[in-house]
Design a protein with these regions (language model features):
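Ubiquitin-like/PB1-type beta-grasp interaction modules and other compact soluble beta-rich domains
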Residues: 1-99
Length: 99
């Protein structure tokens, strides 16, 4: 299946791209996509997927799926195990970072 990955801020610096179309397996979850992209762009890519604000003791995902914040347990109760579908748009780096 085909999905689109959109890169903002530091993600675009790490990848050298603003977006790309990706052909991925039918059963791929968000966690698997991070692993695929880490193999292409290195460990720094996967570390950027998680942010920890100074005021918090927990990490947050720096990822949106179809313009929806993946941190929302109401919309995405499976979190990183949320399965991707044909045509999905996965955005990296929409929170924080530099343009």
């Amino acid at each position: 299946m085909q999905i689109t990955a959109r890169y903002y801020g530091f993600f675009s610096r790490v990848t050298g791209k603003l977006y790309e179309a990706l052909e991925v397996g039918d059963e791929l979850a968000v966690k698997g996509l991070i692993e695929v992209l880490e193999r292409s762009y290195g460990y720094k890519f996967s570390r950027l997927c998680f942010i920890r604000p100074l005021y918090s003791d927990r990490e947050y995902l720096n990822i949106c799926l179809n313009f929806q914040d993946l941190n929302s347990l109401q919309k995405f109760p499976m979190g990183l195990d949320t399965r991707l579908k044909e045509g999905d748009l996965v955005s990296f780096g929409v929170m924080g970072g530099a343009a």
